[in-house]
Amino acid sequence: MQLDNILSQLFENQALTKAESQYFFEQVIQGNVSNEQLAGALIALKVRGETIEEIAGAVEAAFANATAFPAPDYAFADIVGTGGDGQNTINISTASAIVAATLGYKVAKHGSRSVSSKTGASDVLSALGINVAISPQTARQALDENNLCFLFAPLYHAGFKHAVPVRQVLKTRTLFNILGPLVNPAHAKRQLLGVYSPEVLKIYAETVRSLNHQHSIVVHGAGLDEVTVHGETLVAEIEHGEIHYFSLTPEDFGIQRHSIEALKGGEPAENAEKITALLQGKGEAAHIDAVAVNTAMLMRTFGERDLKANVQRVKDLLSTDKAYQTLQNLAQYQ
């Protein structure tokens, strides 16, 4: 396969096969593609619209070149958002991962520093005293013993650094933004995946299906890359190779509505303070409900289908400080 041929195809508005896309992105990750070539390719893909085969090929390239994580044989999930919704809310999926782990569900959360919001998952975890840059073996130990680990994307996908200069100059969403949530190095086959726009719900759902996930749920919540407490959440549930599309309201979870303003966050220290209060059993009502609906949905990927019952379990837990203990335990893994 020739790099020049692939670039020519892209510039002639032709879609790549999965194998061609994988080859191209392996070259990118290995540092064999110039900034000019990469910029041209990413723009060509974006303007035409990336196909499922092209995204899946890029995912396979990322996995083929990633630092290995010793994947467990037990059931575990990931909870992640694409980011880029522009709303600067508190880190709901990070808090939900800690809560789910406290309830006994194993979560290997993949994430990175903030790209578009003030505070990404690793930013808030660092502010909470967690070392996000632990080795794969230590992370696996944390997952085994404490039901929770955080996999810091730059440690596992070091080759993505070759795309950083181009991404910074382009300042627009590219295929790399699509990739982030799909390349968990633990190869999670259960996932709650929040997306920044209703337009990309279907492409994510179909890509997740092509990656043979066991039970994953893609959501967009009225402007948020989360299940929302202020409006309708659009859902694509992928199970046994089938996709079911439906929508949910806060009432379907048995909670009252809250304004999006009630979920606003800020710098890492501010978000860390709010999450600490929540985990200690002193959370604000809107924060409790936002984490409850997202954790409830994550529990569903483990077969816990009753969303109202799931929410109640979370709310009962968040009236105690047990989830804070999980966070403190996680801080011991250095």
Swiss-Prot record:
Residue numbers binding 5-phospho-alpha-D-ribose 1-diphosphate: 81, 84-85, 89, 91-94, 109-117, 121
Residues engaged in binding anthranilate 2: 167
Biological processes annotated in GO: L-tryptophan biosynthetic process
Residues that, per the record, bind Mg(2+) 2: 225-226
Cofactor note: Binds 2 magnesium ions per monomer.
Short name of one Pfam family: Glycos_trans_3N
UniProt binding sites for anthranilate 1: 81
Gene3D superfamilies cross-referenced by the UniProt entry: Nucleoside phosphorylase/phosphoribosyltransferase catalytic domain (3.40.1030.10), Transferase, Pyrimidine Nucleoside Phosphorylase, Chain C (1.20.970.10)
UniProt-listed InterPro entries: Anthranilate_Pribosyl_Tfrase, Glycosyl_Trfase_fam3, Glycosyl_Trfase_fam3_N_dom, Glycosyl_Trfase_fam3_N_dom_sf, Nuc_phospho_transferase
Catalyses which reaction(s): N-(5-phospho-beta-D-ribosyl)anthranilate + diphosphate = 5-phospho-alpha-D-ribose 1-diphosphate + anthranilate
HAMAP family: TrpD (MF_00211)
Protein name: Anthranilate phosphoribosyltransferase
Species of the source: Actinobacillus pleuropneumoniae serotype 7 (strain AP76)
Native organism taxonomy: Bacteria, Pseudomonadati, Pseudomonadota, Gammaproteobacteria, Pasteurellales
